[in-house]
Regions:
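Cysteine-rich micro-motifs
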Residues: 284-294
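A generic alpha-helix preference that emphasizes hydrophobic side chains
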Residues: 2-3, 268, 286
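Conserved small/polar residues in nucleotide/adenosyl-binding loops
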Residues: 1-9, 295-303
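Short helix-coil boundary/hinge micro-motifs
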Residues: 7-279
Length: 303
């Protein structure tokens, strides 16, 4: 019967296949800026965001719990209670992420809306019907009903993907934050100011044995899986070609942003007075963050 085609194993395989191929978000690169969710930022700005609300020490346990629950759910019979639990877990994880500046650029609130739409009572009933259908307990006489169930199964696949993506995103951000922290300290220590000095500090950093150890553990962090397409936009009546990049994971976007930032001479510096990190795009000789600059005429003192 029709039910035989849509076995649960196929559903699981689809989810796992989509994990590696789904484009999560797109970024448009324009000269020395990038745009994401219709907002523009200077290239390299993600490095500032992960240090601004220090993302190195996000507690991973809640994310680990979500990942385990998502895997369990994928391997057992679907039921309403589990779906409601799953929704609650994702929502609480999104609430934690919303406190970190880096996640605000991804319109994480929208993710919450999507999850709530995926787990309305009506949708949950359809998922349960789909479950009975895959076990051949549920015969379908009308093709419209089949279409409805297949559509519901695609929504459910997406709901699973969100669980997996969100639980791995936090690992990628923590990892990136520690890379940014190490490299920024190296640059400040080397007093790198010009693009050439930056390149030297960067080279030292990449060849550092500690960094090599990090790079060998988990997949090589500089391997980017992204799809690039040209987009034409009009600026003051003139057409310009920019590149739009679709990323299927967070790490590739973050690493790309960090490196492109250095290429453009955009980078973080630690204030000589208050030790806070600030982001530079033009101020080659600026040693103090803008707050401390107000106090530094004529001679800087710690405050």
């Amino acid at each position: 019967g029709l039910g035989d085609v849509y076995k649960r194993q196929d559903f699981k395989d689809n989810v796992l296949k989509k994990l590696n191929t789904t484009n999560l978000f797109s970024v448009t690169y324009r000269k020395d800026k990038f745009a994401i969710s219709d907002k523009e930022y200077p290239i390299g700005y993600t490095s500032f965001l992960v240090m601004d609300t220090d993302s190195r020490f996000i507690d991973e346990s809640i994310f680990e719990d979500l990942k385990n629950f998502t895997e369990e759910l994928l391997n057992k019979d679907f039921n309403r209670t589990d779906f409601l639990n799953y929704r609650a877990k994702i929502i609480s994880v999104i609430d934690v992420l919303s406190q970190y500046e880096i996640f605000k650029i991804f319109d994480i609130k929208k993710c919450k809306e999507i999850i709530n739409e995926f787990f309305t009572e009506e949708k949950i009933k359809l998922y349960e019907e789909y479950e009975r259908f895959t076990k051949n307990e549920y015969r379908i006489k009308i093709s419209e009903k089949l279409d409805e169930l297949v559509k519901a199964s695609v929504d459910l696949e997406t709901a699973f993907l969100i669980g997996f993506f969100i639980s791995s995103a936090v690992k990628e951000v923590k990892y990136y934050s520690s890379v940014v922290f190490q490299i920024t300290n190296k640059i400040v220590k080397n007093n790198a100011r010009t693009k050439a000095e930056l390149a030297e500090a960067f080279s030292n950093f990449i060849n550092d044995p500690y960094m090599n150890f990090i790079f060998d553990v988990n997949s090589h962090p500089f391997g980017t899986r992204a799809t690039i397409i040209p987009v034409v936009e009009s600026e003051n009546g003139t057409s310009k070609i920019y590149r739009k990049v679709y990323y299927n994971n967070l790490k590739d976007f973050l690493m790309t942003d960090l490196f492109e930032g250095y290429i453009h001479g955009h980078y973080l510096w630690r204030c000589d007075i208050c030790d806070r990190y600030f982001f530079m795009t033009t101020a080659r000789n600026q040693l103090y963050c803008s707050t401390c600059l107000l106090y530094t005429s004529p001679k800087p003192t710690r405050h």
